[in-house]
Amino acid sequence: MVRYRMRSPSEGPHQGPGQDHEREEQGQGQELSPERVEDYGRTHRGHHRHRRCSRKRLHRIHKRRRSCRRRRRHSCCHRRRHRRGCRRSRRRRRCKCRKCRRHCH
């Protein structure tokens, strides 16, 4: 039996290092101390600040099943001054990863 771990809240400061960690995990989801609230808010806001695409754009990308990186480019013929024809009319590639794109040309 492990009775020495069951202690009243008033005896909190006398806990050992093992029990301290357990109590932290349990209380993390329910309530946050002032320091943790600040950290939590900062990381949460930081996540949104560094979002690459707007929700509308992500929704469009998801509908058309395109990767975010490819969508950020302008049109397929926008920067090409010499006329090669439209690249979109070519056969679709199977995989969009860099390795496969390099070998599919």
From Swiss-Prot:
The record's section on InterPro entries has: PRM2 (IPR000492)
What GO terms in the biological process aspect are recorded for it? chromosome condensation; nucleus organization; spermatid development; spermatogenesis
Basic and acidic residues: which segments have biased composition?
Answer: 33-42
Q: Does the keyword Phosphoprotein apply?
A: yes
User: Spans of biased composition, class Basic residues?
Assistant: 43-74
Q: Which residues carry this modification: Phosphoserine?
A: 8, 10, 33
Q: Where in the cell is it found?
A: Nucleus; Chromosome
Judging by the UniProt lineage, the source's domain of life is: Eukaryota
* Protein family per UniProt: Belongs to the protamine P2 family.
Q: How does it assemble?
A: Interacts with TDRP.
- Mind telling me what this protein is named? Protamine-2
Q: Which organism is it from?
A: Rattus fuscipes (Bush rat)
- Designated gene of the protein: Prm2
